Amino acid sequence: MAIEIGIFHNGASDLKAVTTPNGVVVNDGSLEEVHRSYQRVLVGQVRQGILADRLGYDYWFMTEHHFMPEGPEFSPSPLLTEAAIASQTKRIRFGQMANILPWWHPLRVAEQAAMLDVISGGRLEFGIGRGYQPREAETWGWRYGSTIQDQERNRAYFEEAFEIIMKAWTQPSFSHHGEYWSLPPRHTKWNHKATMAYFNMAKAGRRVEDVLKVGAPDMYSVGSPIMASTTTLKEISVFPQPVQKPHPQVWEPVTSERSIRWAARNKVNAFTVPEPTSRLKRNIEIYYEEAEKNGWPDRLNRGRWKFGWDAEKHRGFGCCRYVHILRPGHEREDLQRYKEPIELQWDYYGPFGFAAVLSDLGEPMYDLNMKVTADLIMQKEIAIVGTADEVVDKIMHIKERGGYDDFMFTAWFEAGGYSTEEIEEQMQVFASEVMPTLRHACGGGPMLLESTSQFVPERGLAGVAGS
């Protein structure tokens, strides 16, 4: 057995949470103060990612969220933030929960994610999602027709974008002509002598006729020689490709059975946050049932993997929970302070339908308009709060109820109103008082390879003043 331990970061504002007269918890600050808060949060995310590596955490996961004055989350570019962390770390692996594919041009996210894999020395865990908040989805997705107000269209767009990214990462050159994307566009004129010279070389590995549809001169065209022809592009190459082959492991945050089954069929690890422990094992069973039915899909074709999580094969169903460790002698005070930030999160999430998934297995679905209290979140074991020993016991209880062989657990420390220093203190206490006990109880941790990437030109700086 083994346990892998990560950190999930959603970027909540560090401004104090306040309960408004109508009972809704929000940021307590002006828009200008929220802007400054998120600047501090961004720097804190980089600091905490570097600290996580030094404390021995295995994974660092970030969300993608935009345009949020209410305060519960901020993470506009997880790939960019993680690239900053990657340049200062050696071991920790970088995931996104998730890159929201309907908000991106698929080749743009393919390039940027591959860049993170290269910069980190092969430490990318590529997370993908569909999005659910209309303020973000309609603002970003309008250009690509990926509205969430038509769920089937959104899903179809997501699946096509995923297919394109996999082609870009695994084929030396490729084309794609689907419902939403034509890549390269069939009308693209490209009569370039350098392209023809390159693909006429045998070592290129592709021929001119593979990548170009060579045509006659266009007597009616004006402009450059590239356009003065009927020669058009047939295929393109995306650079860079990831270091990991055939591609990095892909992840998806899941709640619905349909998403769980799609992930299992498509070699994608599942990741869950807002569901009670009573539902966890059934969702894992659905994932494994679908995987077995489809011949254990895996990017490296390694066959069956252990139930729940397989640390050696890096496959399965990850579990994430809020975690807050109470200080000895300050338990009541710390617990009371923690409740309001949790309700800030859930006053925001609830209206999107997340309240519905809080019901236990076999229990009627909750009213989407219900007030989700911090006490309910703790009762459902979505938030693990207590002394260090109590946190260990609660995490092990979740592992046992989920039926895990190996275990993949991700802790969510940050919450609205907590400073960077307070979040770092939680990380440090967990690493020193919780993590060793979990590692011992679960048979140790993973053997993660260290990056050999070198970003400081030491030879070039020799003798330079201030170096």
Model-derived features: positions:
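Alpha-helix-loop-beta-strand connector modules within alpha/beta enzyme cores
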Residues: 72-96, 157, 427-440
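Glycine-rich, proline-tolerant flexible connector loops at the mouths of alpha/beta enzymes
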Residues: 59-79, 100, 274-277, 410-423
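A conserved active-site cap/scaffold subdomain adjacent to cofactor or substrate pockets
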Residues: 255-293
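Conserved, mostly hydrophobic/aromatic
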Residues: 64, 85, 116, 126, ...
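An alpha-helical appendage that flanks or caps ligand/catalytic pockets
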Residues: 6-33, 150-241, 278-405, 439-467
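Acidic (Asp/Glu)-rich catalytic clusters
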Residues: 53-54, 82-91, 113, 117-123, ...
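Hydrophobic faces of well-ordered beta-strands that scaffold small-molecule active sites
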Residues: 3-9, 60-62, 93-96, 124-128, ...
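N-terminal beta1-alpha1-beta2 module of alpha/beta enzyme domains
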Residues: 1-88, 247-248, 449-454, 461-466
